[in-house]
Amino acid sequence: MTDTTSRSEVATFEELQVRGAVRDRKRTLLPDPAPAEVKYHVVSVDDHVLEPPTLFEGRLPARLVDQAPKIVRNEPRGDFWEIEGVLEGMGDWNGASGRPMNEWSTEPLQYDELRRGVWDPKERLRDMDLAGIIASVCFPSGIWGFAGQKFMRMKDRDLGLACMRAYNDWVVDEWSATDPSRLISFQVPWYHDMEIAAQEVERNAARGVKCVTFSENPEKIGMPSLYSNYWEPFFRACEETGTVINLHVGSSSQISKPSKDSPEEASLALFGANSMLASIDWLYAQIPVRFPKLKIVYSESGIGFLPMLLDRLEHIQMYREYELLQFSWTDKELAPVDVFRRNFWFSTFWDPIAFGVIESIGAQRVLLEVDYPHPDSIWPDVQGRCDRQLSGLSKPIIDAVTHGNAAALFRIPVENLIR
């Protein structure tokens, strides 16, 4: 799903009611699925957590405690985050798993109307066990932005910075601490000062945080483009600490829409286009040329576009001496396609055709994702989806795609997790 938090911002509950944003609705929780027979041991590199009401409790400086974002419940309308006086409804797409598809909507729900694994780490582990997921890398909910954009948008910069740090503390101290080998630690960045951003990466790396979620296209969220040198301290810190940069589709707060009249399903069909465009920008901004050990992962990207893109990158090299094009590539040893294959990883939950040509893509750069608990999620049928896509591949490729590549990338001790 795409981060579209701005659409739910309103001033009062009454305005919600007037707009008709909250209506009578069914609230059904499905029974637990039967535990799957595990054939594929999956590391999911793209799931989401819906943050609990206690997110900021005890984690902000005393002078900011009274301004802390908090949950406000309004019966029967739902639970809302109040952030600097603005109410954000918890759209139920943030917790669709375990609920009937015909009840999904953008309307706010209450925590107790959601499957507990959506926000409780112990129950998340149980839901992972039901589907054969041995480890999970998460992103924030849409409330805070898949790349933590909400913190940079807070009017009080000091409060935004403190909340960003508190969020990262919660991930380490509560979410990941429940089982650090399975709930892989992540962090959100600070966008307004790259020295602070670098220090935060270093602070978190020192306590075992493996990755940082970042915007696929920061220019679209009001920040300098990837072609500026603004981001250098942040990228340097990520490279030096081995912190993986995770780029989720929609983390630029937009998805592809061919025209103003395009229906929503057109954008859904084009989800992979965001990652395709972003990957080319990250490549030709030459970020991985300047930082050759940087690890960049695209989440919810799909892999179907990769054969075409790799072919095209190789083809356009024939024009490198064409003076009118003024090629900007500076690496004298590696061509763009070589750097692309070296520094980028891509994730998918459903690309059966592309898996037929995975060796041309490079199996070592393909990762699996489950996207729990979003509407696109393949939970609980993770094993079935894997079997329909992977059963015809060799065991070394299956093992690499389902868990081996992710284990190497995020330093996950999978040998202790596969039973």
What is each residue range found by the language model?
Residues D47-H48, D371-Y372:
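Active-site metal-binding loops of divalent metal-dependent hydrolases
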Residues G145-Q149, S253-S262, S377-W379:
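Short acidic/His/Gly/Ser-rich catalytic and metal-binding motifs that mark active-site loops
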Residues D3, L159-A162, W175-S176, S181-I184, ...:
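Catalytic pocket-lining loop regions of alpha/beta-barrel enzymes
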Residues Y111-R116, I134-R153, P180-P189:
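Short, well-structured secondary-structure segments
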Residues F139-W144, V249-Q254, Y372-H374:
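Short glycine-enriched loops at secondary-structure junctions
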Residues E51, F139, S215:
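Conserved residues at the C-terminal ends of beta-strands
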Residues T2-H41, E57-E107, D112-R115, W119-A135, ...:
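Mid-to-C-terminal alpha-helical segments outside catalytic/metal-binding sites
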Residues E103-L109, W144-L159, E195:
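Surface-exposed, active-site-proximal loop segments in enzymatic domains
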